[in-house]
Amino acid sequence: MMKEPTYSLHENHAMSIPVAQSGKTRIGWIGTGVMGRWMCQHAMSKGFTATVYNRSADKLQPLLDLGAKAATSPKGVAEQSDIVFAIVGFPSDVRHVFLGADGALAGSKPGTVLVDMTTSEPSLAKEIYEAAKAKGVASLDAPVSGGDVGAKNAALSIMIGGDKDVVAAVQPVFEAMGKTIIHQGGAGAGQHTKMVNQILISSNMIAVCEGLLYGYKAGLDLETVFKSVSVGAAGSKALEVLGPRMLARNFEPGFYVEHFIKDMGIALAEAEKMNLSLPGLGLAKQLYEAVRAQGYGRKGTHALLMALETLNGIKR
């Protein structure tokens, strides 16, 4: 019989982690909202049994209908799982679901793997890593990019920080939900990479919204304009995915404005620690704070268009 592949938990540690196997490895999932529901569903579709928890229990139902089991706390999830994933809203939520008295670490046995897929603070990722290591538990920070479309299509980009051997052990589950899976370095490196991603998006979103607004004001047919500019040098993922939604006046979230503001705040704080000036990011955050002030905090990031319309006295 072929021996099951394993990876050591940490250097100088005797414990090993089996590579995740369909039908054998039990996963836990904390946070089943716009992104998490689909990510967990894809893992289940590959044969991984799941125990799930969400603060709003009604959002669990699609996964329960597919055979997942519900837990009443993050701790309860970990008690029934070999690998625990979480994708929640804010760093305070991350701290609660992993390090709280009723958090996943409290329910983890030695050899469990904790995977935070929330966009959060690099320093918190390192804190979770150290707290987990002290209990013989592994930890990865693995934020994602691709929004709701990427989550639904199992096409996410997953940026991972943590020990290389642990990444290899979790790889089969990552492959169920993403297409681009890259280990960026030690604990916190995944979160730092996601900050790069969000900085790139921030100024690009301003450009997309301002470009379409200019076309509208010039009296152009925006559908026709889109066909030309989306395939040229100005083309971008933001324009490709969110441009049609803006043209259709569909501002429902693939990614919430309020979460994007959180991400930009983290990036600016990290930049300050590095004595790095990022004026474009600062401007983007101010504009998105105006979007939130106008009542669009729970809309998608492309709702920036509506705030710019208001700024220019345009009513549509």
Protein language model features and the residues they cover:
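NAD(P)+-binding Rossmann beta1-loop-alpha1 motif at the extreme N-terminus of oxidoreductases
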Residues: 3, 7-86, 112, 117-118, ...
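NAD(P)-dependent dehydrogenase/reductase Rossmann-like domain
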Residues: 13-18, 289, 293-316
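Hydrophobic beta-strand scaffold residues
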Residues: 50, 70, 139-140, 181, ...
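Rossmann-fold NAD(P) dinucleotide-binding segment
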Residues: 74-86, 90-137
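Rossmann-fold dinucleotide-binding core
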Residues: 119-202
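Active-site-proximal catalytic alpha-helix in oxidoreductases
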Residues: 154, 158-161, 175, 182, ...
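Interdomain hinge/lid region at the active-site interface
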Residues: 187, 191, 235-302
